């Protein structure tokens, strides 16, 4: 029997701690591995970590992984402050975040754990919006297109109700870079992705964007919009188009890990090893898309090399100390 325990709640999100009562296969699992690794960040990545946690806890009842959902930006703030061991992110780390980590002498490793497609959706009753290009999306979310007729002269002269994640989310940053060219998003903003979905389902003129799995979970209530690429080809988000990047709003999902935690916290290093060995299966089970298998293999090889290198360094320091003591 598994038990989810909420260990903290804020306006930005909740932290989940997964424990297990008894091993998943009737055994106690790896009883030698004890401790905790703490993370926070993307609400898009959090469900993948939770799914991985379920599998992990079956054999690691005393090794806890906590995963918050404060948003990518907020997660990086905690990562920079040294409050957490890992940060979940739905976008690559920004240059200014890298600089802040460097200023604090914090080194990190980046792991790509899955792929996603930011999905644009409208109300189920919308019978005219089937596809959009990035310029049309930009017009909608910059506020320049106030009605559907402003987007396409053949569409109704009805006010658009555009909703967006707020700036604490990596999805917001991704959309800002890929669609808005860093022009301000002028739309109703919400920290809760489920609230964005709800807004679109309740408003006939609604439009919103979020991670692919949120669309999959609510596809009976939403209508996805195909996105045109630079050649004008309209493509819908599917596991195939997201993985091969033919969908115009495809993106990788990450876990960033403090190198010190990888070296000093066996729970952290073993969990990341477990994540990579899973090869995206947990992501697929949660409605996301696995990265190509070679991505997991190369990262796993790099992780093992990093751990081995540091183990040899620690062994050498231990041997040197013993030699000094003998003198």
From Swiss-Prot:
One of its GO terms (molecular function) is phosphate ion binding. This is Phosphate-binding protein PstS. GO terms for biological process: phosphate ion transport. It is found in: Cell membrane. Residues 1-20 form the signal peptide. A lipid is attached at residue 21 (N-palmitoyl cysteine). It comes from Staphylococcus aureus (strain MRSA252). Belongs to the PstS family. The complex is composed of two ATP-binding proteins (PstB), two transmembrane proteins (PstC and PstA) and a solute-binding protein (PstS). One of its GO terms (cellular component) is plasma membrane. It is a lipid-anchor.
């Amino acid at each position: 029997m598994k038990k989810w325990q909420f260990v903290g709640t804020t306006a930005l999100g909740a932290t989940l701690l997964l424990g297990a009562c008894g091993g998943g296969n009737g055994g106690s699992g790896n009883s030698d591995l004890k401790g905790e690794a703490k993370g926070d960040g993307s609400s898009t990545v959090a469900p993948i970590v939770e799914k991985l946690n379920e599998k992990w806890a079956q054999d690691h009842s005393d090794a806890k992984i906590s995963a918050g959902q404060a948003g990518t930006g907020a997660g990086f703030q905690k990562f920079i402050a040294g409050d957490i061991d890992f940060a979940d992110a739905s976008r690559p780390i920004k240059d200014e975040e890298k600089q802040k980590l460097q200023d604090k002498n914090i080194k990190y490793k980046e792991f790509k754990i899955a792929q996603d497609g930011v999905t644009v959706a409208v109300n189920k009753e919308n019978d005219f919006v089937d596809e959009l290009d990035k310029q049309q999306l930009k017009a909608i979310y910059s506020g320049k297109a106030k009605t559907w007729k402003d987007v396409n002269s053949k569409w109704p002269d009805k006010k658009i109700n555009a909703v967006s994640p707020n700036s604490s989310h990596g999805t917001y940053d991704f959309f800002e870079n890929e669609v808005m060219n860093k022009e301000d998003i002028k739309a109703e903003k919400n920290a809760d992705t489920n609230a964005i979905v709800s807004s679109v389902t309740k408003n006939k003129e609604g439009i919103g964007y979020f991670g692919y799995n949120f669309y999959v979970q609510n596809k009976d209530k939403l209508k996805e919009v195909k996105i045109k690429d630079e050649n004008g080809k309209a493509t819908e988000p599917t596991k195939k188009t997201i993985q091969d990047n033919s969908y115009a709003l495809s993106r990788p999902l990450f876990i960033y890990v403090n190198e010190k935690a990888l070296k000093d916290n066996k729970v952290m290093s073993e969990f990341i090893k477990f994540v990579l060995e899973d090869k995206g299966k947990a992501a697929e089970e949660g409605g996301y898309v696995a990265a190509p298998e070679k991505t997991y293999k190369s990262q796993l090889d790099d992780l093992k090399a990093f751990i081995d290198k540091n183990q040899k360094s620690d062994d050498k320091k231990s041997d040197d100390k013993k030699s000094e003591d003998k003198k």
